[in-house]
């Protein structure tokens, strides 16, 4: 058997250990996970009710076109139903775009570091990667423009960016979009858009009317609290959606994910409460960092990337022993930084107290700048 050469040696995705495994291995009664940017307040109670009702229909294939959800999302974002494509998480929409546009003769442009799935899917399709380093944690749009050529097919803008939490302003994004060739796809990945508070964040969805090469990605995994159900979507002009729709696998969104997403959209109060609590938690973390003299990237998301000035792996392991799962920055391109998801006030209090203890200890590691 001959596998694609670019897949040989490609490491599989390695999820973090389940909390139950961590409890057992370290002898802990409780473990708090603040590593994957999930909603610490869960999902709307209406979601559980919708799933309970859907249990009566497990023998029937889901609606392959997600009609009810499609209409609900179309109203939510202000587009026509035909301007949407749904995926098993926005990860799958990324995969669909890469399958549709990339091959061995093409290249794709992205920031470095940014969300890992752009790179992974491009490698699988055999495309050349053109990674442009961030400037002060923010996309270098001018640098990205410079590396676009006749073989470029997709440019990725993670906005706000993961792992830094920083964002590209409306003025900068629109100027960038106007300069990208019309035959190059621009993907604005907005997984954290509901958390954004910046007044000058771009309103990208209306831009699909002007820019036929723009795709906007959104997800239900973050503020809506549906990470376990895997549902996301892309927004683009109808002609583009029609071109990529054949690449989408059939029945890729389960009945449960569809009814859950509809229910989540209907509970605006839950979303608003989650956003308000996140804002309070973000203020709690940033004020703590300032008191501790720790640098961080100003974030428009539900996580904060913090400079701890030492091996992030060591800090991660020390925090794990105290019952807190955070994210080491080593795999994210920041070996002396850690990423912490904003939790509830109680979770934040405990995590910050544990982190203060860890940073006060003499870690037998080489300090990194």
From Swiss-Prot:
Xref: InterPro entries: Aminotransferase_I/II_large, HisP_aminotrans, HistidinolP_aminotransfase, PyrdxlP-dep_Trfase, PyrdxlP-dep_Trfase_major, PyrdxlP-dep_Trfase_small
GO biological process, one term: L-histidine biosynthetic process
Enzyme class label: transferase
GO molecular function, one term: histidinol-phosphate transaminase activity
Domain of life: Bacteria
Catalytic activity: L-histidinol phosphate + 2-oxoglutarate = 3-(imidazol-4-yl)-2-oxopropyl phosphate + L-glutamate
Cofactor(s) essential for the protein: pyridoxal 5'-phosphate
Its EC number(s): 2.6.1.9
Keyword Ribonucleoprotein: no
Alphabetical keyword list: Amino-acid biosynthesis, Aminotransferase, Histidine biosynthesis, Pyridoxal phosphate, Transferase
Post-translational modification N6-(pyridoxal phosphate)lysine, affected residues: 222
Keyword Magnesium part of the UniProt annotation: no
Pathway noted in the entry: Amino-acid biosynthesis; L-histidine biosynthesis; L-histidine from 5-phospho-alpha-D-ribose 1-diphosphate: step 7/9
HAMAP family named among the record's database cross-references: HisC_aminotrans_2 (MF_01023)
Subunit and interaction comment: Homodimer.
Sequence similarity: Belongs to the class-II pyridoxal-phosphate-dependent aminotransferase family. Histidinol-phosphate aminotransferase subfamily.
Name of this chain's protein: Histidinol-phosphate aminotransferase
Species annotation: Halalkalibacterium halodurans (strain ATCC BAA-125 / DSM 18197 / FERM 7344 / JCM 9153 / C-125) (Bacillus halodurans)
């Amino acid at each position: 058997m001959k596998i694609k050469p670019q897949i040989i040696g490609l490491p599989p995705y390695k999820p973090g250990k389940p909390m139950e495994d961590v409890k057992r291995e370290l002898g802990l009664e409780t473990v708090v996970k603040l590593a994957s940017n999930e909603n610490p307040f869960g999902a709307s109670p209406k979601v559980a009710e919708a799933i309970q009702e859907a249990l009566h229909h497990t023998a029937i294939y889901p609606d392959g076109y997600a009609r009810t959800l499609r209409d609900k999302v179309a109203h939510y974002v202000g587009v026509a139903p035909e301007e949407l494509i749904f995926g098993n998480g926005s990860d799958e929409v990324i995969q669909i775009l890469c399958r549709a546009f990339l091959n061995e003769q093409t290249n794709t442009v992205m920031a470095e570091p940014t969300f890992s799935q752009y790179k992974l899917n491009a490698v699988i399709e055999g495309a050349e990667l053109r990674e442009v380093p961030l400037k002060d944690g923010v996309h270098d749009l001018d640098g990205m423009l410079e590396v676009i050529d006749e073989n470029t097919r997709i440019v990725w803008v993670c906005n706000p960016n993961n792992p830094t939490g920083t964002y590209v302003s409306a003025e900068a994004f629109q100027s960038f979009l106007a300069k990208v060739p019309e035959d190059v796809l621009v993907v604005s990945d907005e997984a954290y858009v509901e958390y954004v508070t910046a007044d000058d964040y771009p309103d990208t969805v209306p831009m699909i009317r002007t820019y036929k090469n723009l795709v906007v990605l959104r997800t239900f995994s973050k503020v809506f609290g549906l990470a376990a159900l895997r549902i996301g979507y892309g927004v683009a002009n109808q002609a583009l959606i029609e071109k990529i729709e054949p690449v989408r696998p059939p029945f890729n969104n389960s009945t449960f994910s569809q009814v859950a997403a509809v229910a989540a959209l209907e509970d605006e109060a839950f979303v608003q409460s989650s956003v308000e609590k996140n804002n309070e938690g973000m203020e709690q973390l940033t004020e703590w960092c300032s008191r501790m003299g720790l640098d961080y990237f100003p974030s428009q998301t539900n996580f904060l990337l913090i400079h701890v000035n030492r091996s992030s792996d060591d800090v991660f392991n020390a925090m794990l022993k105290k019952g807190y799962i955070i994210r080491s920055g080593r795999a994210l391109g920041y070996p002396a930084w850690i990423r912490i998801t904003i939790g509830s006030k109680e979770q934040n209090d405990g995590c910050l107290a544990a982190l203060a203890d860890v940073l006060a200890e003499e870690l037998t590691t080489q300090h990194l700048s």
